[in-house]
Amino acid sequence: MHSRFIAVTLASLSLASQAVAWGCIGQDCNQAADQIAFSAPEPASYEGKVKSLAWEPTPGQGWQWSSCGTGDEVVNVESIVVSPDPPVPGQNLTVRAKGTVKDEVSDGTFADVIVKLGLIRLLARRFDVCEQARESNADLQCPLSAGEYELEHTVALPREIPPGKFNVHITGENQDGSNLLCLDLSIQFGFRR
């Protein structure tokens, strides 16, 4: 299931980067029906939780993530590893994730994803987690039992991703209304030569 959230995040990043590449930002993107409003936690809640996503512990390679939750969420992500790092527009990106699901995840579970380029909000969208898993023919399907999971997912990044720092914030709720997860990703795309 963690791979599904990362895949949803990367799909959102792909949509957002294409919107930027086509000069389409905000309400002009025909995303109005999908846009929702919610707030990110205060930066103080991130202290001590930032981890590098590089295959080797090399700072500044393009990715960072942090858990912005309280630890009581249904899904607790323990590690995320990406390759290549830094990510390269127009190439495949492989994401490996490891974590724990505390309670069953079933129909009615959703994830809210916000993608920003700097301070500009490119995308805010709610995803039905189980529906996304079915549509993408994911290895794990709902209902998902409590347990530990390690998953790998590869996504094609569009060539049109502009240079810049993308910030992705993911939250959600389980089918019973409990907090699903809280995850922040910072993704730096460099200048093409």
Curated annotation (Swiss-Prot):
- Pfam families from the UniProt entry: E1_DerP2_DerF2
Propeptide found at: 22-54
Matching entries from SMART domains are given as: ML
List where this protein forms a coiled coil: none
Q: Give the record's keywords alphabetically.
A: Lipid transport, Signal, Transport
The function of this protein is: Catalyzes the intermembrane transfer of phosphatidylglycerol and phosphatidylinositol.
Note the subunit structure: Monomer.
The family assignment reads: Belongs to the NPC2 family.
Q: What is this protein called?
A: Phosphatidylglycerol/phosphatidylinositol transfer protein
